[in-house]
Design a protein with these regions (language model features):
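C-terminal motif of bacterial Sec signal peptides marking the signal peptidase cleavage site
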Residues: 6-7
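Conserved beta-alpha junction segments in alpha/beta enzyme cores
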Residues: 14-143, 150-375, 381-610
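Short, conserved catalytic or interaction motifs in soluble domains
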Residues: 10
Length: 610
């Protein structure tokens, strides 16, 4: 029924032409074929500004270069963090990168973009151009790394208050063309390959990847698996999955999949960059050759090393270790250095070399992050396993209402590249349509299996518990998830909980439609008992896969922001209010987003089981 409704309300897809699309080898010989391509999509910077107050944002009265003589400032706006952050230069390029894999008549194309996100109209523009040459629409999975140092491709990061979108329509067309061309180039470069898969949990990469709450030594107490989770509960997705295809002439591609936000250069930057992802790819390409591609995993809630601590790694891969100075070697209270030669490495009681910590909000931090992921990927591949077929890929549509208050206010003024003129407004397909919900959009989830490797996709930033489940093997979690009195500053998972709420708020439902109740700050609270859905029998998404290796692909086929467990969604917050520990709720398309994703993947799983 859903498919019938969508057929009546969405633009129909073109029918693929007959034959082998794009020259992809669709032969039944048991051989894996792969090709890869990379296209530089760095925009030209013509108009720059003078940042008189050093806040990295254009304040309206600061001088600027009016290159086109229009009398208005028309920069490349950088996406991520706050609006009005112009690009004054390029630190490193941003890319569109593609991998095409085929075996025994089946094929798939995976595309990674160094963008904050890309709406489905541009992705489908590329898709339809490929379909015209025989490419099946369900075989194109396009994702954005969620880069916070790239150009705005959504619209929110220009001047939203002034009604000025942050995207350039010509650049948007360029991105669609780059997606198409990258797939064509990758298909044209396909050769037989041996495929290897590897994985590693970043929490297992040494004591400095975790804080004391999680058995490590990082100065950030709740650092876990190289992630500083900024939203309660502290649940992380720290699996790094790596795929590599090697042909007779050398490496064709190396693909990484991990959850960390490419945002660690922070907002105090006016140079375009692919953030840590670019460093990781450069290291892997120097190590192996070929083309490196990154696809994000469960990005949401908040998977990032930002505000954490990382061991310092230099551009050449040198790990910088702390040393003992003259004062330390003479200090009996300094157990690491007392009695050691001056200049010796600082080694703690467990025999671990103590690192120097990278400066936060710096390119050194970006480099350190990129090297950490690259080195883990290299080790994962060294211990990896071979991959053969079969290959199977499928997708499932769903309808998502846009109930976000700010999007319904800003959308009609043309701020977003995903325009309301493309929305579903027929009440049969979008029953939520009202004065507060101006429409719905069609979205898709994908399922891809290649031998022992399985991927599921979402069109946004998935909170990791929706993918991997809850840490119910930890007694601390069991207690804190059920009992709000166990939460607060001394808690491990729910440490931001306002103790003033414990006695005054009977249950979380009382806070879901308000910002505060008396002295209780509702924006510090999260659902109790904490759960993924109020729908019965809802398991984590990756439980649908029985492959040995499994992971999510986030930001795929469109971008509707955060996917949050519906019982934990605060419906009162918006971009026009305080957000507390519910920032993600202010930019998510809808409180029902997670349940719609869960439902769509359930339908997909049911179909695959038949």
């Amino acid at each position: 029924m859903l498919s019938l409704l969508l057929a009546c309300t969405s633009d129909p897809e073109p029918t693929p032409a007959a034959g082998s699309p794009l020259g992809i080898p669709l032969v039944h010989d048991g051989v894996l074929y792969a090709g890869a391509a990379a296209i530089d999509v760095t925009p030209e910077i013509r108009e720059t500004f003078t940042d008189l107050d050093g806040d990295s944002t254009w304040d309206g009265d600061e001088p600027y270069v009016d290159a086109d003589g229009s009398g208005t400032f028309d920069p490349v706006w950088i996406a991520g963090y706050g609006p009005l952050r112009p690009a004054n230069g390029v630190h490193d390029p941003v890319w569109a990168r593609a991998v095409v894999v085929a075996i025994d008549g089946e094929y798939v194309a995976l595309v990674g973009l160094d963008l904050v996100g890309l709406g489905h109209p541009r992705i489908w523009q590329a898709r339809d151009a490929l379909v015209a040459d025989g490419f099946a629409p369900e075989r194109l999975i396009v994702s954005s790394t969620h880069d916070h140092q790239g150009p705005d491709t959504m619209g929110l990061w220009g001047n939203p208050i002034g009604g000025i979108p942050g995207f350039d329509p010509a650049y948007q067309d360029r991105i669609a063309q780059a997606i198409e061309q990258a797939v064509r180039d990758a298909a044209a470069a396909m050769v037989p390959v041996d495929l290897t898969v590897g994985r590693v949990a970043m929490r297992d990469r040494g004591p400095w990847m975790n804080g004391p709450r999680f058995g490590g030594k990082n100065p950030d107490e709740r650092f876990h698996g190289m992630i500083h989770d900024g939203r309660d509960p502290v649940v992380v997705s720290d699996q790094l999955l790596v795929l590599q295809g090697v042909g007779d002439a050398g490496t064709v591609f190396t693909l990484t999949n991990w959850s960390g936000h490419p945002e660690v250069r922070s907002e105090s930057n006016n140079d375009l960059s692919s953030d840590w992802v670019g460093v990781t790819r450069a290291v892997l390409e120097a190590e192996y050759g070929g083309i490196a591609v990154h696809l994000p995993e469960s990005l949401g809630g908040m998977q990032s090393a930002l505000n954490g601590q990382l061991p310092l790694v230099l551009d050449d891969g040198t790990h910088v270790l702390a040393t003992c100075d003259a004062a330390a070697v003479a200090d009996p209270a300094d157990a690491d250095c007392f009695g050691q030669p001056e200049g010796a490495d600082r080694i703690d009681a467990d025999g671990d070399h103590v690192p120097v910590w990278a400066e936060q909000d710096s390119w050194a931090f970006v480099t350190s992050h990129g090297w950490a992921i690259a080195e883990a990927a290299i080790d994962a591949l060294a211990a990896g396993a071979p991959v053969t077929g079969p290959l199977r890929v499928d997708r499932e549509p769903f309808v998502l209402p846009i109930s976000n208050e700010a999007y319904n206010v800003l959308g009609p003024i043309g701020l977003f590249d995903i325009g309301l003129d493309q929305a579903i407004t027929d009440s049969a397909a979008c029953p939520e349509v009202s004065d507060d919900v101006l429409g719905c959009f069609e979205a898709h989830v994908f399922r891809l299996e290649l031998g022992p490797v399985g991927f599921l996709s979402v069109p946004g930033e998935l909170l990791p518990e929706l993918a991997w489940g809850l840490p119910t093997d930890d007694p601390r979690w069991v207690t804190e998830a059920a009992d709000p009195a166990a939460r607060g500053a001394d808690a491990t998972y729910f440490w931001q909980h306002d103790p003033d709420c414990t006695a005054t708020v009977p249950d979380y439902e009382a806070c879901r439609d308000t910002l505060a109740i008396g002295d209780c700050d509702c924006l510090t609270l999260h659902a109790w008992p904490y759960r993924l859905s109020d729908q019965p029998g809802r398991a984590p998404l990756l439980d649908h896969l029985d492959t040995e290796y499994r992971a999510m692909i986030g930001m795929a086929d469109s971008y509707f922001s955060y996917v949050i467990p519906e019982p934990d969604f605060n419906r009162a917050v918006s971009l026009f209010t305080d957000d507390g520990d519910h920032y993600e709720d202010t930019v998510s398309a809808a409180s029902v987003f997670a349940d719609r994703v869960l439902d769509a993947h359930q339908r997909l799983a049911d179909r695959w089981a038949r």
